[in-house]
Every structure is written in C-alpha cells, then in structure tokens.
Regions:
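Phosphopantetheine-attachment site and its flanking helix in carrier
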Residues: 34-52
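Phosphopantetheine-dependent thiolation modules in NRPS/PKS and related acyl-activating systems
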Residues: 1-34, 52-80
Length: 80
C-alpha cells in the first residue's frame, strides 16, 4: 500500500467524522487540530475508524500525530 492510497482511505474516514471538510484541500501537511478541528474526542474516533478501515492497530504509547501525513506514516508503519 502506498502513502497516497493511505491518504485516500483516510480522506474517507475524515469525510465521515468531519462531513463539512473540503476533502480536495486535505493533504499530507493538513494539520489535524488547526485545519480540521480535531479535538481529543475526535482524535480517538479518528484512530478507531482508521484502525477499522485499514485492519490494523496503532501501538500504545506513540506520540499523537499532528498532521494527516503523520497519520498516514503511522498506518504504513503498523501495516509493515
């Protein structure tokens, strides 16, 4: 799976969690909190939905991602 494929899948997750988001503006550098309005509860929901979407688990104790690209990288790392 490529980083772009993960981004495309993550956009599907974001579309459900944040339906008002213009997905054409979401890229690897998009900031989760400042640009998407992801708060702590939304971050948990994003993590759970991403794990379900990609059939993987994020490791415990990892620093919380701050950008969409960091989420993509964490997914790829977990799938490796």
């Amino acid at each position: 799976m490529t980083r772009q494929e993960v981004l495309d899948g993550l956009k599907e997750v974001i579309a459900v969690l944040r339906p008002a988001t213009d997905l054409s503006e979401v890229n690897f550098d998009t900031e989760l909190v400042r640009e998407l309005g992801i708060d702590s509860l939304s971050m948990i929901m994003l993590s759970l939905a991403t794990e379900e979407k990609f059939q993987m688990r994020f490791p415990d104790g990892e620093a919380a991602p701050t950008t969409v690209g960091e989420v993509c990288d964490a997914v790829l790392k977990a799938l490796a």
